[in-house]
Amino acid sequence: MKKIIKWNKTVSTVILIGIIIIAMMCSNICVRDNYYIKEVFNEEGISSKVNIIPKPMSYQSKEGKFILTKGSAIYIKGNTDEETEQIRWIAEFIRQKLSLSTGFPLDIIDSDKPVNGSIYLTTINSNKELGNEGYEMNTTSKGVKITAYKPEGISRGVQTLRQMLPPEIDSNTVVDNIEWTVAASVIKDKP
């Protein structure tokens, strides 16, 4: 019986990773009229457009921006050890993706007490009404927090995070002279 339970957890984790990889690959596909462009103004008054595909349920811009640096880390915490492990797989995937273009190590830390300048992925104190794939992403100058009811929602949230960064984030080699910023905002979405 224990082998079956362990096998089921392993299979669940492998399936989740597969879904994450497919979703991340598909996130670059533009669906007509199903995207969101928000004009955001930086501190100098220069506008930039934020493209989010698919269009989120709500987007509220705030003042400021988060800057991803070589000292940034990814903090993870689930409601259970199993959720934390699933979130770790998502964090590993996004770390690999972001590190290619930024060159930043982005350590993954198992803690519900993220420090300033970090990304925090969690299911703690989440909103059940968002469903299994919904998420809330709150970005301030101090950090990015993606909260979801289930790890599947965190997977969708990190796709949005990736889209909020400069387009050079998709480079397979380190890009120099880029400030890796995310506009301060609150985004809520569910399929």
Task: Indicate where each model-derived feature is located.
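N-terminal Sec-pathway targeting helices
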Residues: 2-16
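Position-driven detector of the extreme protein N-terminus
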Residues: 2, 25-26
